[in-house]
C-alpha cells in the first residue's frame, strides 16, 4: 500500500508530514507480543455471490468457504465477519446443506462443525449474509487510519452531482472481513470466485480474470471473476462504477486502466509505462509477472494513496491528471511502480504478520529507486533514494525496530520505518554484496516462498544461500534493531609523513555501535582510488599514504549509508 504521505513531494514530506510524534501516555502495548496468527483451519477456496444495494449501502452476499484443518484435528471454525447480519450457516454435502449451529458477536462468527475433521479432510461452509459496512464503521470505527468498513459506497444515492457513484474495497489490514466472511490474516491464502450483480450501466473489477458476463431480465448484469492462484484475503478486491476501460497488453496478458470517462484520452499517458515496468521487474527478479492480468482503477475519496490488490490495484483520484498537468510530468509514476512491484513482494510472497510488514513495503519502496535508475539514470535514482532516506531521518522514528513485535495498533506499522528505512536498508545490502548477488537472492526468496507467507528470517536465508555469507549481523543490526548511526568524520593530514588519517566517530545517543562497511574514495585530479574498510567501533581511524596531498577524501563514496553526519565537523591539518 502506498500511504498518502509517501506519495507527496520531498518538500511536504519533510516539512509537514513527518512531524515529531506525540508522546503516547498509554504504554501497556509495549508488553504485548504480537505473534503470528495461529493456523487452526486453512482457507483453500472462497466463492462469493454478491449484490450491492446502493440505496442502503448494503451488500447482500452468499459465501462458500472450503477449508481444512492446518494440522491438529478440529470440530470448530472461527471466522472474521464484521458488522454483518448472518442469516444462515450450513455445511455443504453434495447438493444438500446441513444447518450448523453458530455464535456471532458482530466481529467473529464461531461455527460448530458436524464432526471433528483431520488435516487431510476438507469441508465447505455456506453462509448467507448481509454486510452493512457503513453501520459497522459508525458503531466501531473510532479513529482507525483507513477505517474498518472494508467496502466504501461513494455517493451511493447520486446526491452529489459532481461526484460519480462508486464502490471500492480496502482490505488491508484486516477489513476484507467487513464485506465477506473469511479468516482475515496475512498467513492465509486461497483461490477465489466472485460473481457480482450490478446495474448494467456499471463496470466491475475484481481479482483474476473476467470469465463471463450475463445480462439479467431486471436490467442488471452478473459478472463472474475467477482467480485460480491463491492469495491473501486482505488482497481481495471489488470495484464498481462508471469507468472507461482503456486496454493495454503485456506478453499476451490483459493490462487495463479503469478511469473516469473524462480521463480516457490520457489514461495511457498516466499508466502507459506499466507494460515496460512489468518487463523490467520481471527481468530483475527473474520471475515473470505471475498473475493472469493486471488492472489499475481509480477510486473517489480513496482512503490511502494506492493499494496492491492482486491483479487489481486501486489508486486515489489524484492519479487522474489531465493533459495540461501531465506536461510537467506524471506525479503518479512512482506510485504506479510501487504498487506493481507489490504484485511480487506482498502478493506473490506475503508477509506472514504485520510485524514483518517491511517485507512487503521496503521492496515496493525500493522499486521506485530501481525504476528511476533504469528509466532516468543514476542521478535521478540517487535523488529519489536520498529523499526517501530524509523522510525517515526526519520522522522521529529512530527508536522503532524495522521488524517489531510490539506495537499499539497494526496500522502503526505503516510508517517511515517499514517503508523508507526498509528501502534504504535494501539499497545498502545491494551495495554491500553486489548487484548480481542481490538480484539472485531476491529471486531465491521469491521462488522459495512463492504463494506463501514469509518473515524476515526467510529473506536472510535466501541471501545467505546465494552469497555463502552469514548475514545475521546485518539483519540483527538493521531488521531487528532500531536507529541509525550518527557520525563525526574528521581528516588529519601529515604532509611530512605523507599520511592522511580518516577518523570516523559514532556519536549516536545509544550504547549501540553499528558495523559499517565503508568505501573511502581518494581523489587526485581525475584519478580515484577506493579503499574498502570496516567501521566497527565507537572510533575508527584509517590511514592513507600519499606522495601528494589528495584533492579530496570522500567517505561513503557512493553515498549509500543510512546515517546522519555531525554538522560541526572540522578538518585538522598539521605539517
Language model segments and positions:
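Bacterial Sec-dependent N-terminal signal peptides
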Residues: 1-23
